[in-house]
A protein has these predicted regions:
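Acidic/glycine-rich beta-solenoid
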Residues: 1-179
Length: 179
């Protein structure tokens, strides 16, 4: 078995995690740092990767997340929100694929995702692009907020995965009632 131990600071916040699996000790999370409002602003994992988080001072929403390994940037996400805090977009501006010494598998890369919502704040449209792949997704809802359709199209050089789902309910006047 494995025993995971949470270590806390004086404020009761997790500051590190360790593991003991079959007698072998390891560090899962070496350090977690917080700001005065209790937001996580820094994490260092057991593998040495470090992440910093920046928040909007007025609305306390995550604005930016930066991930580094061996001092080199791996990911730099920037987040956008609407007036009611729905996330409108995530952009990663770092392309770590050129860093062959720390990214032998050539994972990650620049990406851009956008989201749209209806007047009830339900996700109705999403688009994104990363590497050589892109996707679109659209959803519709009924009067009781039940999903009616979901159409997703994925296009990449390696594969294309598309689907079109139509949801049907036995009792249209009570679509969310148990049957």
């Amino acid at each position: 078995g494995e025993i995971v131990t949470y270590h806390y600071n004086a404020a009761g916040q997790v500051e590190s995690l360790t593991s003991n699996k079959l007698g072998k000790e390891s560090t899962l999370i070496a350090q977690v740092g917080y700001d005065k409002d209790g937001h996580t602003v820094y994490t260092k994992l057991g593998n040495g990767t470090e992440t910093t988080y920046t928040y909007d001072k007025k609305r306390e929403r995550l604005e930016e997340m930066n991930l580094t390994a061996a001092g080199s940037p791996i990911m730099q996400n920037k987040y956008r929100y609407d007036a009611v805090d729905n996330i409108l977009g995530i952009i990663n501006t770092v392309d770590p694929q050129s860093q062959s010494s720390i990214n032998k598998a050539k994972l990650g890369g620049a990406s851009n995702h956008s989201y749209q919502y209806d007047e009830l704040n339900r996700l109705i449209h999403a688009t994104g692009k990363a590497k050589n792949a892109s996707y679109t997704m659209q959803m519709t809802f009924g009067r009781m907020s039940e999903p009616l359709t979901k159409v997703q199209q994925v296009d990449s050089s390696a594969t294309a995965r598309n689907y079109n789902l139509v949801y049907k309910y036995e009792d249209e006047s009570h679509p969310t009632a148990p049957t």
